[in-house]
Amino acid sequence: MSNFPWLTIIVLLPISAGLLIPLLPNKGNRIIRWYTLGICLVEFLLITYIFCNYFHFDNQFIELKEDYNWINLLDFHWRLGIDGLSIGLILLTGFITTLATLAAWPITRNPRLSYFLMLAMYSGQVGLFASQDILLFFFMWELELIPVYLLLSMWGGKRRLYAATKFILYTAGSSVFLLMGALTMGLYGSDGPTLDFENLANRSYPIGLEIILYLGFFIAYAVKLPMVPLHTWLPDTHGEAHYSTCMLLAGILLKMGGYGLIRINMELLSHAHSIFAPWLVVIGAIQIVYSALTSLSQLNLKRRIAYSSVSHMGFVLIGIGSTTDIGVNGAILQMISHGLIGAALFFSAGVTYDRTRTLFLNQMGGIATSIPKIFTMFSSFSMASLALPGLSGFVAELMIFLGIVSSQNFSFLFKVVIIIVAATGIILTPIYLLSMLRQMFYGYRIIKNLTSYVTDAGPREIFIFICLFFPIIGIGFYPKLVLSLSNSKVESIISGNFSSK
């Protein structure tokens, strides 16, 4: 226990420090870069300190809970806390954001605003995962929108305004359902309004209302996850955004949807979740295959990786829909694993673009000998993405399959069909990833005289590569590093709300 407001500090520190960026000396970008990187490092060290000193692996309850009165009318409090669902994603947020800040160093146009927006995203993401108030959860959810929109529209590619507008329309439009659901849950009942997750977990709703609430929240999460057919904003966004922004999107932003499904839909609306769980599994299986096939047809490198992300998030839907301990833990592991792998792939694509000045696979070829270090790391991360044994993706997908097999909520025929469909997606994954590597690095060199003006990865880029690769290997060989964080909490959710384990 601690009376010190640790969580409030880690939520407010990045955005508060970002407000000081305009006061820094205007002597090039060096001071701004190091200042922002220093803030990110301090934040990540604080998160690590909190994890090491105040998080207990066998505790299923909220720890370090902070509750400060904010708006009395709606019982709107500044409520924060950590548990097994949130701590892993908070650590992932700190890790990926720090590396994304380092990856953004080549940005030279208006770096003050760029780094401030990244720090604002940092606060919003940590705040969302630490929120214990449903309206505060919505507030942090919305805090992401403007920074991403500006990062995309100001530092994106040729079609950046189209992609940014599409992003804001999809995400802001779906957020209306999140707000309506949050207010309805908070105001429902005769015992007065409450927005506290702990109190909401003890409330019951008429099944019709619970289904409506579930669907409202689900629409918001389906856009962020993203879920087919609400996914079309993601390839456009990734295709136009700077690769440091892509790292934040793939590494953290998509995980907000999966986290919301577990935190609110599964934990607070368990009866409705039991009804819709088979549909989550079906949609997840279809998404895996559809996105894999679509990825195979993409000539743009970043769009191919984006569709790969959509495909991999289909496994998260299947794991959450399985309503089993091993399946839900597998979904959480998949979110963290993909957060690392997705960020790594987009960084690899970005540094490759910095050298070739093209993202189109049919304009590359034979560049492996010119950039062997980038080739090695790009290939390694692609192997992780196709779930090679010994790397993090393999364990997560295996657990999700075991979750479906062990579930008592589905018929044998249903399980067989889902496994066959999902396995088809797994077969397609190495096809589109290996063909991507072949088109980029092997064959005839299309870009002439590449070696005369291109250098391989430098110290900064190699450092980012190594920092991303070690956790992928570590989780692959010892997945208990992540599973021990969420196991107790997931077990309490399943045993308390669902009959099948």
From Swiss-Prot:
E.C. no: 7.1.1.-
EC top class named in words: translocase
Single GO BP term: ATP synthesis coupled electron transport
GO MF annotation list: NADH dehydrogenase (ubiquinone) activity; ubiquinone binding
Principal subcellular localisation of the protein: plastid
Membrane found in the keyword field: yes
Localization, UniProt: Plastid, Chloroplast thylakoid membrane
Any GO CC annotation of this UniProt entry: chloroplast thylakoid membrane
Membrane-crossing segments per the record: 4-24, 37-57, 87-107, 113-130, 134-154, 167-187, 207-227, 242-262, 274-294, 310-330, 331-351, 364-384, 385-405, 416-436, 462-482
Alphabetical keyword list: Chloroplast, Membrane, NAD, NADP, Plastid, Plastoquinone, Quinone, Thylakoid, Translocase, Transmembrane, Transmembrane helix
Keyword Metal-binding: no
Family of this protein: Belongs to the complex I subunit 4 family.
Listed name of the protein: NAD(P)H-quinone oxidoreductase chain 4, chloroplastic
